Amino acid sequence: MAEFETTFADLGLKAPILEALNDLGYEKPSPIQAECIPHLLNGRDVLGMAQTGSGKTAAFSLPLLQNLDPELKAPQILVLAPTRELAVQVAEAMTDFSKHMRGVNVVALYGGQRYDVQLRALRQGPQIVVGTPGRLLDHLKRGTLDLSKLSGLVLDEADEMLRMGFIEDVETIMAQIPEGHQTALFSATMPEAIRRITRRFMKEPQEVRIQSSVTTRPDISQSYWTVWGMRKNEALVRFLEAEDFDAAIIFVRTKNATLEVAEALERNGYNSAALNGDMNQALREQTLERLKDGRLDILIATDVAARGLDVERISLVVNYDIPMDSESYVHRIGRTGRAGRAGRALLFVENRERRLLRNIERTMKLTIPEVELPNAELLGKRRLEKFAAKVQQQLESSDLDQYRALLSKIQPTAEGEELDLETLAAALLKMAQGERTLIVPPDAPMRPKREFRDRDDRGPRDRNDRGPRGDREDRPRRERRDVGDMQLYRIEVGRDDGVEVRHIVGAIANEGDISSRYIGNIKLFASHSTIELPKGMPGEVLQHFTRTRILNKPMNMQLLGDAQPHTGGERRGGGRGFSGERREGGRNFSGERREGGRGDGRRFSGERREGRAPRRDDSTGRRRFGGDA
């Protein structure tokens, strides 16, 4: 086993890669990196058995990048990943690792992204292709992905691909790759199906086994909340209000998210600030100093920006965006519980991210308990307790006499009416409560939360499981929302831009988290379109839609007024009626939540989805590969 004192330079990596590692803050290789990099540099096949979060992305990326030819504009490295989230993460990492290698391009291919975007990226001759099995196989069948020059193949999280039912696609892809290439396979477990692949496709692989060293301290209380019933920003405010903390750090994935979350917290009265890579060193140090001395209570940061952060005051860590690997999670929550203090760590998990939660639990060898969203009753109780504590503090002050003298000068509104001190106290209480009212309206009833289950628990499903159509005709149809509850909006994309109704529905449903059954009539014109949406759209949602892009053009959504009645047979955009494209996903503006996505796992375009893509447009700042999604 390699010693931790080994440096990346000792492993034989060249200057451009070492420079990139230095820029990224890498100091010394992890055990799996120290073991795998020399073998891969020497052209050996490698079979790596390590948990997520062990640093395996760098373990295979660095040596394969060093061995490729930047002058050859053809795919030389192919990485297979089980989900689009992991594919994007690996593509981002390989882009960072190769940033000082001139002429090296990376493209990510996954379901849900338009084919024309991916075809444009492939025509540019990327040397590195990262993708999900289904979409990669589609490109191979279409003849749009040429692997004749491939020199390196990586199967990342092979056991996860087996669990998700992709292993046949993986074998089909591997059978089409020319001989003479190098293969690296990484898996946390080694079931027989994976062993069969190693025997069939790998040449005397060097086995590398790394036991997880990821641990967490018992003085950090951990829990997770399944994102359900309201937006993450709204839920974050509730959790912060329900928690007792000295200072908190909130981790997000992108630089833009640090600013957006900080703005949301400032609007709700929290003293917060963003910390991201765009800040110069002087501003960064100033922000951290404010956090240390108590002038700042909440910091919103990315993983990179928070490296080296050590502030004893931090007693709460919120993983607003779940990290993609277990090691990052441990590093994040390690920011709390310093100097012998107890710490709290909260993790937000969306249903599509349950695999990442399972990886964290498996690596850390513990089960993280789930918590419920603080309800209105709890918030009201907390607010009253805090207010009562402030009142008690004032009751103990020594300068109340001069204020007591003012009571006699406050006259009742009606002549002859005596001043009722209890009523006066109630009026002053109402005035003093501030923006957070002491009386919290009860929560609106929500639909029951879906079970938080793995795909394995549901078992396989095909068309024959659904029963004959005649057996399903008694199901009640959902009622269409009355037009009187709708408003008409204009968006600046139209037929001349190549937009179709499905593009608009997808953008509104996904970016606004709105059920498509709450989307009304859509009409396409040459240079613009109109769309009906429920009344009461929050300003922040409209602002988000203004920046959201469809076919790489901003929507610039504007309210035109109330929707006008129209005939029930009217079709949207001159095409298929909306009833043929509905799905039970999203929510309306009143906060009603959906029952889930489309059961067949397909987008409005009919393309297969291999796991929902992370939301991304120019307003979120998510990095893109090969064009717009």
Swiss-Prot record:
A motif (DEAD box) lies at residues 156-159. GO terms for molecular function: ATP binding; ATP hydrolysis activity; RNA helicase activity; RNA strand annealing activity. SMART domains: DEXDc, HELICc. A motif (Q motif) lies at residues 6-34. Residues 446-481, 568-629 have a biased composition (Basic and acidic residues). One of its GO terms (cellular component) is ribosome. Residues 438-481, 559-629 are annotated as: Disordered. Residues 37-208 form the Helicase ATP-binding domain. It is an enzyme of class 3 (hydrolase). It is found in: Cytoplasm. ATP binds at A50, Q51, T52, G53, S54, G55, K56, T57. Keywords: ATP-binding, Cytoplasm, Helicase, Hydrolase, Nucleotide-binding, RNA-binding, Stress response. Its main location: cytoplasm. One of its GO terms (biological process) is cellular response to cold. It catalyses: ATP + H2O = ADP + phosphate + H(+). NCBIfam families: PRK11634.1. Belongs to the DEAD box helicase family. DeaD/CsdA subfamily. This is ATP-dependent RNA helicase DeaD. It comes from Escherichia coli O157:H7.
